[in-house]
Amino acid sequence: LCRDRFGEKPLFFLKESNELYFGSEIKFIRCLLDKKLNIDLKKLENFLKFGYKYIHKNNKSYYKNIYSVPSGSFLKITNNNIEEFKYWKIKSEIIDIDEKTYFQDLREKLFASIKLRLRSDFPIAFHLSGGIDSNSLAFIAKKYFNYNLKTFSIIGTDPKYDESKMINFASKQLGADHTNLSIDVKKINFLNILKKQIKYHDSPVTTINSLLNYTLYKKIKKDGFKVSITGIGSDEIFSGYYDHHLLYLNEIKDMKNLYEQSCANWGRIVNPVVRNPFLKKMKLYINNPMFRKHIYQFDNFKKDLFLNDKSPNFIE
């Protein structure tokens, strides 16, 4: 039983007596069993304690005895024995090349990736925000591959998060056929959306963004698109979170010149736009290296965690 290299396609399995059940959805396994599944309360408890960054620490599902096959792996099943083998993993190595070459390699790989994803039998929609990630993808598709852009954006009512000015500017510069979807969060029944998403995924919803994106995807589908491209994931690749900057400062604290220069850049460029009061502290990880231990240390975590009301660890 084999899963693709990156785990793009879900694959779950259940071994019961002399039978093996597997499928891309847990609800499919439930239909084959024709009986009720039991929720793994420990898995659910850990999700509530540690958040979505915990859920991929192991291959357990939210149902007892149902597991996912890890990405790039296959299972060998013989009688009552299940063996797991890793057939592929990312190879990484540090290559000493100059900065210009790094940028050129990155540019070539990004362009090749976009070109590959534009190769589709169906028209493709683009998500467009006020940020650099989605704008870069749309710009490359338009300028370098002459793609006829159809873009979609969510526009909220809270002025603190209103990116409509940048979105409208970008869509005009791109010459895109653009649609703004205005959302008033006070008028949306998020509980109904939440129930639907939990039913679809057979698991809790990880972030609030998925609730908003659900309404955007409905609009995209209504307009005749089956495929869309977003800038989601760029922050993980290019250290786009403030935590990454603070962890970096902690790593270079003994390199005096670089540390002082980086601290000056942080204070001048980054700090003014940080809203989280904890992440505004430049020496956060220097003074408290275990600040985010709930993300990467969980086996011996305190069981009375919920008693620590308003813990800074859970300010995201």
Locations of regions flagged by a protein language model:
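Cysteine-centered catalytic environments shared across enzyme families
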Residues: L1-H201, N213
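Glycine-rich active-site loop/lid subdomains used to bind and stabilize high-energy intermediates
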Residues: N79, K172-E316
